[in-house]
């Protein structure tokens, strides 16, 4: 596995491989890799000649009071995991490589990026869309892989790709979960033992959503209220977002007829946990596809 920090060197190498007809898959990450990331890598390895994994803790997507400075980092460990998984290239630029001068250009999808998680993290999704667009321009992959846990992010990036006619196909890979159902996340390392035990209320709330809808509940406002009450059983859990939205567009719905996504953004201690589940009559939208050809995510995969 070759490691790059220079944009120009990576571009030069990939250009030569593309001229040979090689296909390129990209897995964008912020590092501190876990089994969920490696599931993305495995999918990319199966579908592409060349796999590029990027590790970049992007300052544009962190607010002034967020965890940029303490976000977990271990590049040596991550590189060893990627090397063992058969990744071809690791792109790990510094901030000075990605943003050699202050960014005056921002990619924003405001109608989608200021809802749900974006409502409590102003500017977050503009930072995400900007760095992902830049990574797409640098790597020029045919396919890029994202975890379904970040459901809103996938919908926003898909809209960005469609609106800007970017020649990349997006694949949303089902969430990987621990044995008790908690979605794997690099931020789980922040949780104390008591908080980790409490965090299981998040996937349990999604189970409750699925049960209520299966039992015939069709009022999204009532579903949100009942899920908020369910979360309140755990005193360490403080819900910031409990929302029921159209699974394809993230728009509010008046009735749970078509598939909806239940989106949760819950603070446990000082750690924000993000999770979601698609519920409804089935798990598909349109031509059974969303986010570049993938089925909508359901419960995910247990590790």
UniProtKB/Swiss-Prot annotation:
Reactions it catalyzes: (R)-pantoate + beta-alanine + ATP = (R)-pantothenate + AMP + diphosphate + H(+)
Binding site for (R)-pantoate: 61, 153
Active-site positions on this chain: 37 (proton donor)
Gene3D superfamilies membership: HUPs (3.40.50.620), Pantoate-beta-alanine ligase, C-terminal domain (3.30.1300.10)
MF annotations from Gene Ontology: ATP binding; pantoate-beta-alanine ligase activity
Cellular localization per UniProt: Cytoplasm
Binding of ATP, residues: 30-37, 147-150, 176, 184-187
Pfam family, one: Pantoate_ligase
Any GO BP annotation: pantothenate biosynthetic process
Pathway: Cofactor biosynthesis; (R)-pantothenate biosynthesis; (R)-pantothenate from (R)-pantoate and beta-alanine: step 1/1
This protein's GO CC annotations: cytosol
Keywords linked to the UniProt accession: ATP-binding, Cytoplasm, Ligase, Nucleotide-binding, Pantothenate biosynthesis, Plasmid
Cross-referenced CDD domains: PanC
EC id: 6.3.2.1
Enzyme class: ligase
Residues given in the record as beta-alanine binding sites: 61
Protein role: Catalyzes the condensation of pantoate with beta-alanine in an ATP-dependent reaction via a pantoyl-adenylate intermediate.
NCBIfam families, A to Z: cyt_tran_rel, panC
Complex formation: Homodimer.
Additional note from the record: The reaction proceeds by a bi uni uni bi ping pong mechanism.
Entry's family note: Belongs to the pantothenate synthetase family.
Name of the protein in its database record: Pantothenate synthetase
Species in which this protein is naturally found: Rhizobium johnstonii (strain DSM 114642 / LMG 32736 / 3841) (Rhizobium leguminosarum bv. viciae)
Gene name linked to the record: panC
């Amino acid at each position: 596995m070759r490691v790059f920090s220079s944009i120009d060197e990576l571009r030069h190498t990939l250009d030569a491989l593309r001229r040979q007809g090689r296909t390129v898959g990209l897995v964008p990450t912020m590092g501190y890799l876990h089994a969920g990331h490696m599931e993305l890598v495995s999918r990319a390895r199966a579908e592409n000649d060349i796999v590029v994994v990027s590790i970049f803790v992007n300052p544009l997507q962190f607010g002034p009071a967020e965890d940029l400075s303490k976000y977990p980092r271990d590049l040596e460990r991550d590189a060893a995991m990627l090397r063992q998984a058969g990744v071809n290239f690791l792109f790990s630029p510094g901030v000075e490589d990605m943003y050699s001068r202050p960014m005056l250009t921002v990619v924003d999808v405001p109608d989608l990026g200021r809802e749900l998680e974006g409502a409590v993290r102003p500017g977050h999704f503009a930072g995400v869309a900007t760095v992902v667009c830049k990574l797409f321009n640098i790597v020029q992959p045919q396919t890029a892989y994202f975890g379904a846990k970040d459901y809103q992010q996938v919908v926003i990036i898909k809209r960005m790709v469609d609106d800007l006619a970017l020649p990349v196909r997006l694949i949303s890979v089902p969430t990987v979960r621990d044995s008790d159902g908690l979605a794997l996340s690099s931020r789980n390392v922040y949780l104390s033992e008591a908080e980790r035990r409490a965090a299981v209320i998040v996937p349990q709330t999604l189970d409750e959503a699925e049960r209520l809808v299966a039992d015939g509940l069709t009022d999204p406002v009532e579903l949100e209220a009942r899920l908020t009450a369910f979360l309140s059983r755990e005193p360490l859990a403080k819900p910031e977002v409990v929302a029921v939205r159209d699974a394809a567009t993230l728009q509010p719905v008046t009735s749970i007829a078509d598939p909806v996504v239940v989106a949760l953004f819950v603070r446990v201690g000082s750690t924000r946990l993000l999770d979601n589940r698609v519920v409804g009559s089935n798990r598909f939208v349109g031509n059974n596809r969303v986010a570049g050809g993938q089925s909508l995510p359901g419960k995910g995969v247990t590790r």
